[in-house]
Amino acid sequence: MDVRCINWFESHGENRFLYLKSRCRNGETVFIRFPHYFYYVVTDEIYQSLSPPPFNARPLGKMRTIDIDETISYNLDIKDRKCSVADMWLIEEPKKRSIQNATMDEFLNISWFYISNGISPDGCYSLDEQYLTKINNGCYHCDDPRNCFAKKIPRFDIPRSYLFLDIECHFDKKFPSVFINPISHTSYCYIDLSGKRLLFTLINEEMLTEQEIQEAVDRGCLRIQSLMEMDYERELVLCSEIVLLRIAKQLLELTFDYVVTFNGHNFDLRYITNRLELLTGEKIIFRSPDKKEAVHLCIYERNQSSHKGVGGMANTTFHVNNNNGTIFFDLYSFIQKSEKLDSYKLDSISKNAFSCMGKVLNRGVREMTFIGDDTTDAKGKAAAFAKVLTTGNYVTVDEDIICKVIRKDIWENGFKVVLSCPTLPNDTYKLSFGKDDVDLAQMYKDYNLNIALDMARYCIHDACLCQYLWEYYGVETKTDAGASTYVLPQSMVFEYRASTVIKGPLLKLLLETKTILVRSETKQKFPYEGGKVFAPKQKMFSNNVLIFDYNSLYPNVCIFGNLSPETLVGVVVSTNRLEEEINNQLLLQKYPPPRYITVHCEPRLPNLISEIAIFDRSIEGTIPRLLRTFLAERARYKKMLKQATSSTEKAIYDSMQYTYKIVANSVYGLMGFRNSALYSYASAKSCTSIGRRMILYLESVLNGAELSNGMLRFANPLSNPFYMDDRDINPIVKTSLPIDYRFRFRSVYGDTDSVFTEIDSQDVDKSIEIAKELERLINNRVLFNNFKIEFEAVYKNLIMQSKKKYTTMKYSASSNSKSVPERINKGTSETRRDVSKFHKNMIKTYKTRLSEMLSEGRMNSNQVCIDILRSLETDLRSEFDSRSSPLELFMLSRMHHSNYKSADNPNMYLVTEYNKNNPETIELGERYYFAYICPANVPWTKKLVNIKTYETIIDRSFKLGSDQRIFYEVYFKRLTSEIVNLLDNKVLCISFFERMFGSKPTFYEA
């Protein structure tokens, strides 16, 4: 029997079992049940003394036990680490057992199961059926997994089954209550093992009149009275809410491979199961494959206490307890962990994922026709957009113009769409799927058949969006890749933090190297300095800036320094200068490089003036060996990715290389995380210390370098910053570039693992050509050991606001001057939620203007500053005088909560007063809009005081009175504060700001 493993899960009844859900080549699903064991590692002496004898025991052979407590010394008299060798046993017990002096107890039982039996969680195997006992059709028991799974075979493709779903619930203004508000719609995207895809929506007929129900039937909707009448081939089905819920129960109890929702663990699934129990007393029941255990669908929460005030909660995750092998997957939780976005609402995520450039085909009266294909954007972008458009109802044009779809024509690699849209002047626009321009509360207020059918379209689109996002993020291949890499079941891959997922690979390595790491002392946690961030040299750059990144800096630092808890010889600290001087002189004599590396770190305690960590590089440590394995595996899968021919292979190999990248980069963080099995304070701070020296070294050789006559003169000798080696340190290097090239280089910024180097050229093609040669020379001559850099991009018209805040046009290393550059806004207001649309529009306009000025190169920085400030004053005065912009541009939003440090917080007072005077109150957890409003007769106010008193909540009924105006000065001051931080002339900026607002601006820290 040839099978592929697709999920592992446990039952937690009186008799615990581990189950494998697998699939045969013919698509048949097979479950295999194993005994569940608790695992203990003991010495031979303890093993022989156990009474009663262990249930099962396996010899692990001779293993070396190393004490990894940190040795802190005020001199060089450092004691050797405690180390012993003994025969070890792995004990398996069906129930927990108290065994004294057991080691390696921090590892998961499931990881022990895989590793001790030689099983890969996502592997393909030819099973030896003599070790299988049939329980029922499709379910077997296995007591000897090692022999049953002895024959691993090449990977083969299998089909998967999915259920993507979304629900809509009646509500007015408040969040729906399961006790009051019925479910109006449930939409499903159902994909079976044959690949057949069904889309259907159930509409609650109890919210419609009998006349409307009859009209719906006349329009082609199916009306059913019971579960038995359900036809899944029909797109729209009318039924009572109880029938709707029973159909949901039937679907959720099926054994799909995946049930996928967006925030469904916290809302959709919880609402369905609670509403079902409330109306019928029934529960959704899952049964184990052997049919011996039944559990009710239940959502349980995992919380982590927040540091933000008493009782505050951060990072609450929701999980479904089930025992039938289905993976209940919440896209919301997954994307929160894997993507850094401004907002995690479904519309914002889909806007980020599904967008493409569209070409204007026709302009009509209040409508426009767009076409998108491989000629209007990068290959594949239009095809992905078109797929979502099949169910899409609204398209966002140019970031913020929301347009209803009138007609659409979709083909394999493109689309044509007619939108209800104001006439726009440009030939091309960015099209994306953002927020549908609908007010659900108002729709429920005006609810009728047409609205019900409209909502059905929105609901099925959201269900399908789950499928599109599932495919966009490659969740299935990432799940399999994670299971293989982390040695975890597919159902647990995304449930654990990095400190837990690293345990599987670590256990595997420790068993291979016959090593046990133990601590006898309590782990201590001290702060330490992070990566080096340079201050920007200037604000605006008319010349191009080359971006170089270290490849996997921290992993390679750990490998270079052999940083690991057991390779740490000790830490030498000093309390006075004399001690420090003596220690420095003797260190290199006793611990000479390159066998040893001494790392100068910031002192851990205020009474110390120096701290030096010493690492032995003669025998590779656990962390470097682990990292080398991860990086080698990543390189192997990247190579396989390039050679892959099928899309399935490409997806798998890309997910595998990405997973190894993530896990390698997480190791540094785990060294500094006290609850991690890899915790090593000295290693973590030594890692950042070496990283800082490496970025400073690269900056020092590039800052002031010159290219002429085919020769590159680096700014400093190419000396290893840690110890003398036999490399050529001559800073003059021959290049393969034309001899007529003459350019100078200047380092202008850097952050942790990247250096921004200005070249005195505005030619994109030459900049890319030179940067690629620089990359080669730096890797061959400047860097050493395993350190490598990569040329990432050319930044054109770079505007640096401050550290970690910049705007630029990015040309990637693979592009040229004819390529369309990508606009990058890092850490700026365009990416934030707490600024008004007016602010975002204006800052975007002024950054574009600055970029154009830099490109033209006709003005110096003073002239640019004068021109920008003069234009800004004109725009602000004009807006103040005309007062023509709508209130919507000045609205801000805020979440109402009670987790304030002060009980009389103005935000709380604002909502309390609003609720006193309005029947529709703002509840805790509800987001509300507000704006700054003042009396209309108030003249331009320079000095702004007590601005919170001008906050006014904006609801649907709010109208700006004739005696009121927007308090423009609040918005203008915030906007101007950001703009002056883009300009180089502080004197002019201060003068302008004082004249406009009566105070000096706040300049961002360099």
Curated annotation (Swiss-Prot):
Induction: Expressed in the early phase of the viral replicative cycle. Keywords: DNA recombination, DNA replication, DNA-binding, DNA-directed DNA polymerase, Early protein, Exonuclease, Hydrolase, Multifunctional enzyme, Nuclease, Nucleotidyltransferase, Transferase, Viral DNA replication. It holds the Pfam family DNAP_B_exo_N. Its EC number is 2.7.7.7, 3.1.11.-. The keyword Repeat does not apply. One of its GO terms (biological process) is DNA replication. SUPFAM superfamilies: DNA/RNA polymerases (SSF56672), Ribonuclease H-like (SSF53098). Disulfide bonds: none annotated. One of its GO terms (molecular function) is exonuclease activity. It catalyses: DNA(n) + a 2'-deoxyribonucleoside 5'-triphosphate = DNA(n+1) + diphosphate. Interacts with OPG148. Component of the Uracil-DNA glycosylase(UDG)-OPG148-polymerase complex; OPG148 and OPG116/UDG form a heterodimeric processivity factor that associates with OPG071 to form the processive polymerase holoenzyme. Belongs to the DNA polymerase type-B family. Catalyzes DNA synthesis. Acquires processivity by associating with a heterodimeric processivity factor comprised of the viral OPG148 and OPG116 proteins, thereby forming the DNA polymerase holoenzyme. Displays 3'- to 5' exonuclease activity. Might participate in viral DNA recombination. Does not perform OPG116/D4synthesis across an abasic site. This is DNA polymerase.
